[in-house]
């Protein structure tokens, strides 16, 4: 049996036991602190070791990108059953090449390079977790937003498996049922105007 040896950052699950379901707005951490929050406790483990391990939780970054026209970057793709679905923003696990210091910041920079040729300014919004979904229960996402001028950036739009597009708030609402679990939580945040 093939084992996926890709490594991702994890922390002990009891460290994040106070993080409830859905979205928790940040009220205490500065942007700089959010980058370093898991540095001392985070360790890198192969995915196959932690897939169903209840002792650890994977740390990921979620970046919402908004332009001056109040449009949001989405990724249109097909899921494992070949059904069309969409992801809001950029999601990625924190990987070893991100290092042990400011690993979250380094991962944000690395993941945005797949979309834009310049660095973005991030704002830390809070954390996201979906305790109702077995597929993502063991993942905790740090949520950031970056606002850009659409005219100043070249969006790398085409990929073999998906296409990057800009959606208005109304388009997000209209295609809500096609959104991934985490994207639905973030769309709820946008609709409720928490950001």
Over which residues does each language-model region extend?
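Nudix hydrolase/Nudix homology domain
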Residues: 1-3, 40, 46-48, 81-96, ...
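Acidic, metal-coordinating catalytic segment for phosphate/diphosphate chemistry
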Residues: 2, 16-62, 68
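N-terminal secretory targeting and juxtamembrane "stalk" segments of secreted and cell-surface proteins
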Residues: 9-10
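Conserved Nudix-box catalytic region and its N-terminal flanking loop in Nudix hydrolases
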Residues: 55-57, 64, 70-111
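A structural signal for short, well-ordered beta-strand segments
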Residues: 61-63, 124, 142-146
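Acidic, glycine-rich loop-and-strand cores that form catalytic or ligand-binding grooves
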Residues: 110, 114, 118
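A short coil-to-beta-strand element that immediately follows conserved catalytic motifs
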Residues: 117-127
């Amino acid at each position: 049996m093939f084992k996926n040896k890709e490594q991702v950052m994890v922390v002990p699950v009891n460290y994040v036991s106070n993080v409830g379901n859905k979205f928790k707005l940040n009220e205490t951490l500065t942007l700089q602190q959010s980058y370093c929050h898991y540095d001392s406790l985070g360790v890198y483990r192969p995915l196959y070791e932690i897939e169903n391990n209840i002792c650890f939780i994977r740390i990921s970054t979620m970046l919402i990108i908004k332009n001056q026209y109040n449009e949001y970057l989405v990724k249109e793709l097909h899921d494992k059953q070949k059904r069309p679905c969409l992801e809001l923003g950029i999601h990625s696990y924190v990987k070893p090449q991100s290092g042990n210091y400011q690993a979250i910041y380094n991962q944000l920079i690395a993941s945005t390079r797949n979309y834009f040729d310049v660095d973005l300014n991030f704002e830390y919004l809070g954390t996201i977790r979906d305790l109702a979904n077995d597929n993502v229960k063991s993942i905790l996402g740090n949520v950031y937003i970056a606002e850009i001028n659409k005219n100043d950036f070249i969006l790398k739009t085409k990929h073999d498996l998906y296409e990057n597009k800009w959606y208005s708030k109304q388009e997000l609402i209209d295609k809500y049922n096609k959104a991934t679990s985490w994207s639905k939580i973030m769309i709820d945040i946008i609709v409720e105007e928490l950001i």
